[in-house]
Amino acid sequence: MQPQVKTGCQPREIHAENSVSPLTRLSGVITQFSSDTALLLIDVQKGVDVLEHWGGPTGRRNNPDAESHMLRLLAAFRQHGLTVAYTRHDSREAVSPLKFSLPTGAQKEGFEVQPTDICVEKDVNSGFVGTDLEIQLRRKGIKRLVIVGFFTNMCVETTTRMAGNLGFDTYLVPDCCATTNRIGLDGADYDAELVHDMTVANLHGEFCTAITPGDVTALLDADAPQLDRVQGNE
């Protein structure tokens, strides 16, 4: 009897546990952030403030308090002895302000990388592509990520999507992120707040659970029965 030859993509087997929407099945109380949780800061570099590069002649950003919120979370994670991880961007683009060879490639004040931190250097949007970020996180037993940084719709979004796809329990803190206006193909100038809000709406409930800075600091000390974990796409 000739063995059966299978060609092309085979359908995924559907089990009873998969008969419920992932969003429904996996939602629930968010438990306390502990040693399995890392704060991941994306590209907190001086070059993000060169607004005309990112948003054109009318360049402007949203959320001017993002850095102060990030600093408070950073201090809280360090105080609790939890893992801190950074991505730093060294652009392939000659005109980008995010190049290590330029002063604008340096970290913003207060976000200096410490010897005990995880830090990866990247030249694409995702912190997981071309780096050993996932390996370093897994080695430390990290299963949950709290993601903050720049820009909401670029490297933050790409890294958050990949984190969710890689199986991390992923939390995005929109108040600790920011972006700039974007110029569309037709020349339309899309406001930074609109770009930011739409990005968060796309990510929340699919690739991550979006929470506030206050939620994060509270979760460092206790479970949060009032919050729902709504990450799908798992």
Regions found by a protein language model. Give the residues of each.
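Acidic-leg catalytic submotif of subtilisin-like serine proteases
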Residues: 38-48
